């Protein structure tokens, strides 16, 4: 976004944590301070709307604060309340004016709880094909037909990569 003229108030790496683990605990004070300071800054600037992108453990609290002060809030990437921690729907109701959903079944879950929601689709849906030819992939990667293929997708967060690095390296030499 910085390449497109947006100003970053904090480097995104400071918030690139996942879940609730030791990394988050070690950085809790810093993350909490960023969220508090961001809220203070937004309340002083009074934007027409705040759009929180994913990161519900960070954004929902911030959105609740902004919404309580009369700032419209939109959340992009619905938390997976249909899979786990469904009780978050109540916090979402207090925090979000409108939820933008990646999956077509999600808006109904929100509508049933009085929350405006719109299915917007997944950003990768038009990029990743629904069907692929295994043979074409094997040819492109020059893999023999009977060669086992294993995909490991560790994510992009530094903490996740560090946690899984030994496993990834060991997997490179694994025999299946």
Show which residues each predicted segment covers.
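Active-site donor-nucleotide binding/catalytic segment of nucleotide-sugar enzymes
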Residues: 139-176
